[in-house]
A protein has these predicted regions:
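N-terminal start and proteolytic maturation junction detector
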Residues: 235, 243-245
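Rossmann-like NAD(P)H-binding beta-loop-alpha module
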Residues: 171-207, 211-212
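Glycine-rich flavin
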Residues: 5-12, 16-173, 206-210, 214-227, ...
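Leucine-biased recognition of intrinsically disordered, low-complexity hydrophobic segments
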Residues: 242-243, 252
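Glycine/Thr-rich phosphate-binding loops of Rossmann-like dinucleotide-binding domains
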Residues: 1, 150-152, 187-189
């Protein structure tokens, strides 16, 4: 969007295509890309919810007497408010593109098989069964971002697993959760779920946060063992390609 608006500011006629292919669980969202819809924004809102929960538990140290039985976490309320905030941002981005004289098309663009280098075709959302519409251009910028992948060679993963594309839109709480992987997105999601009161197990192939400073990641690991395991969560590590994780009252997961 930044490139589209900048090009329009310099006098170019600009069309911006945005299309979200639903996740394996059917999750889809509006204009704004990963950060706004399934990344930074919802993650920070849910992290904030987790921090507030911890603050309530510690409030009595600062003179606030909040009874434990009165502290009830409502997942549906959090998800509803998160969605509403994201929709507000989606609307704001649409207005911003219009103000910048950028034509926004909610559709899937592609290059035809026999391409002259200056033609693409697109199908608008909700009109996928209609013939593609051709569009000529002088220059094209491809900036589609990335999506999380579910390994298709793991039986049941595609049908039952969710990703960060889904966690912020779940209509019911995730309950006991196995987080497979130990990158920063995995630990962020596992962290706010744990602090919101859910039992979380993180399955680690080798080390946490590969590529990050080891002193910092070792400290994070120590804190996870200290705080997560005390609340019913766990950290399971393995060196190799096959992992067996047995979660109490849950299922045996082969990885």
């Amino acid at each position: 969007m930044a490139c589209a608006k900048e090009a329009a500011r310099h006098g170019a006629r600009v069309v911006l295509f945005d299309y979200v292919k639903p996740s394996t669980q059917g999750t889809k969202w509006g204009l704004g890309g990963t950060c706004v819809n399934v990344g930074c924004v919802p993650k920070k809102l849910m992290h904030r919810a987790a921090v507030i929960g911890q603050t309530l538990h510690d409030a009595h140290h600062f003179g606030w007497n909040v009874a434990e039985e009165d502290m009830k976490f409502d997942w549906n309320q959090l998800v509803t408010n998160t969605r509403n905030h994201i929709r507000m941002l989606n609307f704001g981005y649409k207005k911003g593109l219009k103000s910048a004289s950028v034509t926004y098309i909610n559709g899937l663009a592609s290059f035809p098989e026999h391409n002259d280098g200056h033609t693409l075709q697109y199908v608008k959302r909700f009109k996928e069964k209609e013939p593609p519409v051709p569009l000529t251009f002088d220059k094209v910028l491809i900036a589609v971002g990335g999506r999380p992948a579910i390994p298709s060679n793991v039986p049941g993963a595609v049908e039952h697993a969710i990703t960060s594309d889904d966690i912020f839109y779940l209509n019911q709480s995730p309950g006991r959760t196995l987080v497979v992987g130990a990158g920063y997105i995995a630990l962020e999601c596992g962290g706010f779920l744990n602090e919101c009161g859910f039992d979380v197990t993180v399955a680690v192939r080798s080390i946490l946060l590969r590529g990050f400073d080891r002193d910092c990641t070792n400290k994070i690991y120590e804190d996870m063992v200290r705080w997560w395991c005390g609340g019913g969560a766990g950290v399971v590590g393995v060196v190799g390609v096959l992992l067996f994780v047995c979660v109490d009252m849950g299922k045996l997961v082969n990885w």
